[in-house]
Amino acid sequence: MLLKSLVKPKERLVTVREDVTLEQALKVLEDSGYRCVPILDETGQIFRGNIYKMHIYRHKSRGGDMQLPVTSLLKNATKFISVNAAFFNVFFSIKDLPYIAVLDDKNAFYGILTH
């Protein structure tokens, strides 16, 4: 239960849907000031991964198509924990990430846990 109290719920987060373009995702990232945000499916329930501003900038600087779907640069698709995970598992999972996605008992996106 303690972990659940530390999680920022999805209703309080900036996210993008998997059907947005890289151009749209970059605008969301720039407007929010975050370096990355979660990518969710079209229903807003399933965590697909993260999109990083740095990867979009790199893609754009190399002349990449900004109309590609955000999923073309998706990262960290397997980096998530259960809301009921033990703290021991959390420490090892989050160490190289700005945050880790948290899934509920039905594997729906619940929110994020930050450092």
Write out the residue ranges for each language-model feature.
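Short, flexible segments with low predicted structural confidence
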Residues: 1, 28, 44-45, 61-66, ...
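Bateman (tandem CBS) regulatory domains
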Residues: 1-13, 66-78
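Short beta-to-alpha loop/turn elements within the nucleotide-binding domains of ABC transporters
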Residues: 20, 51, 68, 85, ...
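Short beta->alpha transition motifs characteristic of CBS
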Residues: 34, 38, 46-62, 95-101, ...
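Alpha-helix boundary recognition
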Residues: 7-8, 30, 61, 74, ...
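The conserved cystathionine-beta-synthase
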Residues: 15-34, 39-41, 79-98, 102-106
